[in-house]
Amino acid sequence: MSEKLWEKGYTVDEEVEKFTVGDDYIVDMRIIKYDIKASIVHSKMLQRTGLLTQEEQKKIEEALNELLHLVEEGKFQIKPEDEDCHTAIENFLVKKLGETGKKIHTARSRNDQVLTALRLMYKDELKKIKDLVVELQKSLDGFIERFGQIKFAGFTHTRKAMPTDFATWAGALRDALQDDLKLLETVYDIIDQSPLGTGAGYGVPIEVDREFTAKELGFSRVQWNPIYTQNSRGKFEYLLLHVLSQISYDLNRFASDIIFFSLPEIGFLKLPKELCTGSSIMPHKINPDPLELVRAYHHFVVSRMVMAVSLPSNLILGYHRDLQLLKKPVIESIDVVKNILRIMKIIFDRIEVDREKSEDSITEEVLATHRVYELVKKGIPFRDAYRMVAEKYGREKD
């Protein structure tokens, strides 16, 4: 029988327990390896400060490495009665080591414990997302090398506007992603603070070496104020989701462009059939479903970002169970953004440009603004030149 970390000798109503646990025991499988690694470092700190003997620390570390191996092999699952990964880890240690296992929670709370595991995961995931962004930028460079010189009519208000080329078009996404990388690095730096040792938001009444654990865990610095450390849960998630939403926003806009430009009626771009799906009733349909999902997933991420910024609002300082609900939306959004980055790389690696249809789109009216500036170069005031050209095209349309 699993014991709760907060066990006090009474039994919680079964429905209440199911409600409060929710699917946290499932979600926590994503962070358990980080919690195990942080627990190993925590045990080393306890030994350094005299709260564990060298032999006790060695046994705990060996047991935690065994658990980590089981997790990585898919041979360990958190049970609903464990509630979360923190309880599952401690119960494993107690079952394995007895009294020694009960010492692992000395000088920490589940609050700083989960913050530590989450931030370690966030840092890893941000690195992966950065790599995927860079890979997409390389694909964009390849697209520009193949098709960048081809011109076509750019659009405003979903109407033909002025000439542009595919180097400028694809370069816009590459540059947008570069700004996203700067934002990502800023968010990474903010998250890169160790919360371990702050307890439930008011520190722990015993000596701890927070600088040691921060260094061992790979954090660049310690987040010293214990109240702000707890208050930053929700804030840091919002910042993370904000940068994810910026990436998904840029991909959303370009997915819309590709869908529009690959319309048979437009035809600038050609999507390979293997990147499309079909209709269950209309045999002729070849649909850009992956791009439509890329477009839609931006709204998925934004909705999670709104949840992250609104859920902690109006809470007094300190931990609240409300914050448990942020884990799953953040993890889901991380996975979504990684997936849409991969899909957009595949798209840009394999999409083709129809040179003839693209260049044929630059009809006479698309050059109207250029005609205005030809007159300006002859000394005619811009507004007069504008009206002269506008009148000409107005007559032609009539």
UniProtKB/Swiss-Prot annotation:
Instruction: Look up the record and name the pathway of this protein.
Output: Amino-acid biosynthesis; L-arginine biosynthesis; L-arginine from L-ornithine and carbamoyl phosphate: step 3/3
One GO biological process this protein is involved in is: arginine biosynthetic process via ornithine
Q: Which Pfam families match?
A: Lyase_1
Q: Which GO terms describe its molecular function?
A: argininosuccinate lyase activity
InterPro entries assigned: Argininosuccinate_lyase (IPR009049), Fumarase/histidase_N (IPR024083), Fumarate_lyase_CS (IPR020557), Fumarate_lyase_fam (IPR000362), Fumarate_lyase_N (IPR022761), L-Aspartase-like (IPR008948)
Query: Per its UniProt entry, which superkingdom is the organism in?
Result: Bacteria
Q: Which GO terms describe its cellular component?
A: cytosol
EC number from the UniProt entry: 4.3.2.1
Keywords annotated in UniProt = Amino-acid biosynthesis, Arginine biosynthesis, Cytoplasm, Lyase
Q: What is its main location?
A: cytoplasm
Q: Give its localization.
A: Cytoplasm
Reaction(s) the record says it catalyses = 2-(N(omega)-L-arginino)succinate = fumarate + L-arginine
Family the UniProt entry places it in:
Belongs to the lyase 1 family. Argininosuccinate lyase subfamily.
Against PANTHER family, the record matches this protein to: ARGININOSUCCINATE LYASE
- This one is known as Argininosuccinate lyase
Organism, scientific name: Thermotoga neapolitana (strain ATCC 49049 / DSM 4359 / NBRC 107923 / NS-E)
| Organism classification | Bacteria, Thermotogati, Thermotogota, Thermotogae, Thermotogales
